[in-house]
Structures are given as structure tokens and as C-alpha cells.
């Protein structure tokens, strides 16, 4: 037995050694993934942590930061700055994706598909996010925007109930 009360030595162990460097990398990786999951209170992170205001103000999908978090409509939103958080807080309906984390085109077709925050469209001042590969989702959705929005709104409660 060794001084810790275990038989055998580290050299005999079939498990590879975990170095301090490896442990540090594991902790860093865990920290990077943690903000993009469900919180301890059970509220999911909206649009995978992307800042909804950034689509409008920066013209690009941009990941928000946990330190600029706001809860709205049973979801947690992350923002790139306190300014973006305050803009959203003042008018969340303006900035939130129209169909939350669902692909807008899939809902219009009566299907359920998770949205990809990198595949998006702003039309008539509203943010739509798609799961289908660009440009299929946005291009197809925009061909008959009014009808697709109406179908998606009609199908959403049915899809959510599944």
C-alpha cells in the first residue's frame, strides 16, 4: 500500500495521468459551455446565447455575455453590452425572434426544427431565425412572407404541444 492507503502505484494504473494542464483545459472548456445551457432555475438560454439586439444594431449574429443577462418570457437572454440589454428590456417584442428558438420556415411547414442563430432574416422590422441551411430557409420564407408568418403562428401552438 502507498501512503494514501491504495495498493499499486500510479505507474500500474490503467488510467492515463491527468496533468494540471489537462485539468485546467477541462475547466476552461466547461466554463465556455456552461453559459449556453439551462440555468439552475430551469430557464433555458434563448437563441443559444446570441444577442437579439445585435442583429438589428450590428447587422450580424453575435454571442452575448453572461454578465449582461436578462430574463424575459421564461428564457434568459445574453447581450454584448449593458446598452443592448437596456434596449431589449425597454422593448423586448421588437428585438426577440418572432418564433423564439424555432425555425420560422419549419413552423410554417408544420414541422419542428431548432433554429440556428447564424441563419437569420430581418423583414418588416422583425427577426426570424431558421434552422434550414442558408439561403433555403430565409429565401423560401421571404417568397410569401405574410402567408408563412400566418402559417407559422397557426402551427406554433400545435408544434409546442408535441
Give the location of each predicted region.
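Short, Lys/Arg-enriched N-terminal segments with co-localized hydrophobic residues
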Residues: 2-14
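Compositionally biased, intrinsically disordered/low-complexity regions enriched for serine, proline
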Residues: 11-13, 32, 41
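N-terminal secretory signal peptides and thylakoid transit peptides that target proteins
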Residues: 13-30
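Hydrophobic h-region of N-terminal signal peptides that target proteins for export
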Residues: 29-37
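Charged, low-complexity intrinsically disordered segments
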Residues: 36-162
